[in-house]
Amino acid sequence: MFKEFKEFAVKGNAVDLAVGVIIGAAFGKIVTSLVNDILMPPLGLLTGKMDFSNLFINLSGTPVDTVAKAKAAGIPTINYGLFFNNIIDFVLVAFSVFLVVKQINRLRRPETPPPPSTRQCPFCLSPIPLAASRCPQCTSAVEPTAT
């Protein structure tokens, strides 16, 4: 049983997954800081520090001012303001991740395409293998190309 666990733990997929989760958690902290510390302050200035967190529907009829007071009193509420805040947070985080990934992808070197394995027959324009000496479509004799 230990041998099976050892094989599982050191397999490439399990190790790659562990590294991905660890890097993802660290990257999540960077994105959260980007949103909270860099993007939200100017956005707060533009929107007049708009906060939807105290927008709710009281389901009991007992008057309360805030969601916190309703929760403390055990009053059922539909907290649509918190939902809006979470939607705004998600959109900002998703857009921030998009921008960061876009910049990372710009730094990557483009992959070189593999060399072609076919060429065009000069007579019928059909694709033929590079080493072919005769076109299989029109049966014309062609010079083989060095591979």
UniProtKB/Swiss-Prot annotation:
Keywords, ordered alphabetically: Cell inner membrane, Cell membrane, Ion channel, Ion transport, Membrane, Transmembrane, Transmembrane helix, Transport
Keyword Cell inner membrane: yes
Recorded topology in the membrane: Multi-pass membrane protein
GO cellular component terms given for this protein: plasma membrane
A Pfam short name: MscL
Subcellular location: Cell inner membrane
Disulfide bond entries: none
Principal location listed in the UniProt entry: membrane
Superkingdom of this protein's organism: Bacteria
Role played: Channel that opens in response to stretch forces in the membrane lipid bilayer. May participate in the regulation of osmotic pressure changes within the cell.
Quaternary state and interactors: Homopentamer.
Family recorded in the similarity comment: Belongs to the MscL family.
Protein name: Large-conductance mechanosensitive channel
Organism encoding this protein: Geotalea daltonii (strain DSM 22248 / JCM 15807 / FRC-32)
UniProt gene name: mscL
